[in-house]
């Protein structure tokens, strides 16, 4: 599956904690690229409170990505690489980063990325 196909497959999906949120969106792409789901042992969560607890137990998104992916300069990020903007896991795509928000997919300028990981 290409990144474009992956993003397109999420266009009509509604936000749902533990099923279609920023973490599952990024983790799903990482699994496609690496063959490993780094969230498997940490599922399920169904509420914002449960998600926050799971992330705290993991050490946070930065820790999860640092432990499992190669950190890179965000200026060197390619399509499909991972970033975190305002606490939201996102994927680089062209001039933007894309993530799942409460109202569907959200896009931000890629220059907002302060960190990145190669996927």
Question: PLM ranges: what are they?
Answer:
Residues 37-45:
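Short acidic alpha-helical/loop segments enriched in Asp/Glu that coordinate divalent cations
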Residues 21, 37, 79-81:
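Acidic side chains
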Residues 19-21, 42, 59:
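Solvent-exposed, flexible loop/coil residues
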Residues 48-107:
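...with weaker cross-activation on analogous glycine-rich loops/strands in unrelated enzymes
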Residues 14-34:
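Active-site nucleophilic cysteine motif
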Residues 107-119:
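Protruding loop/beta-arch "assembly-hinge" segments enriched in small, turn-prone residues
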Residues 4-14:
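Generic N-terminal amphipathic, Lys/Arg-enriched alpha-helix
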């Amino acid at each position: 599956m290409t990144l474009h196909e992956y993003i397109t497959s999420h266009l009509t999906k509604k936000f749902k904690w533990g099923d279609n949120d920023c973490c599952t969106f990024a983790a799903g792409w990482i699994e496609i690229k690496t063959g490993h789901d780094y969230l498997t042992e940490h599922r399920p969560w169904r509420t914002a409170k449960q998600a926050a607890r799971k992330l705290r137990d993991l050490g946070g998104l930065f820790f999860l990505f640092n432990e499992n992916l190669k950190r890179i300069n965000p200026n060197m990020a390619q399509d499909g690489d991972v970033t975190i903007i305002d606490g939201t896991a996102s994927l680089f795509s062209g001039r933007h980063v894309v993530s799942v928000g409460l109202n569907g997919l959200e896009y931000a300028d890629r220059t907002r990325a302060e960190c990145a990981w190669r996927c």
